[in-house]
């Protein structure tokens, strides 16, 4: 039972993977799509993917992959994120000219980076990849925004810590599988909908959930590239597929919407 994550050792995805699967063989890959493909081709049982951050919002690439890939969410995990500024041994804050990190991490630390407006910001694939680059380049003018674990793994000094603008900074990770695993304990259901382009349609569709006593946890829209200013909706609700009001809503949606995909029925892991 292998588990795969995107990035390198020290990445936040790696931290979550080790928390959820401490005794399982893990593998790291370069991109989110690579991670999902490892699951689809049978090389891994699960992959761990970040889907949303409480400060910077959704990871849009992941939402697009959930649409086109035949995987389901089987669990979610919220990780409190505290970013550190990491430099080579002996570097000081005054030495820094360039900061590397994942675009989401740069956004989460935007207020801190504004205070250091002279620094160049360069996006890389992953926070831990950024730490590894700083270690490999051995340049005191470079820093990475990453986890304290990345600093330990890549022998870097912590120049500053807790630099994210929101002290409650949290990233939601999902566990993806190609096996459609649904448990009677599952309490969250994720869907993708596309609606007819008609006036009041979104209002009517959301009303179906309310009338059936279902709590909408999240509604996120993404543009449909091939349809100008039309959107698909990613919806999270509280509920279980075995409940009559949930099955009733799904039957109504099948008749009313132009596209429906169940992304998973799952629980939060604490």
Q: What is the predicted function of each stretch?
A:
Residues 1-270:
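Domain-level signature for soluble enzymes in the chorismate/prephenate branch of the shikimate pathway
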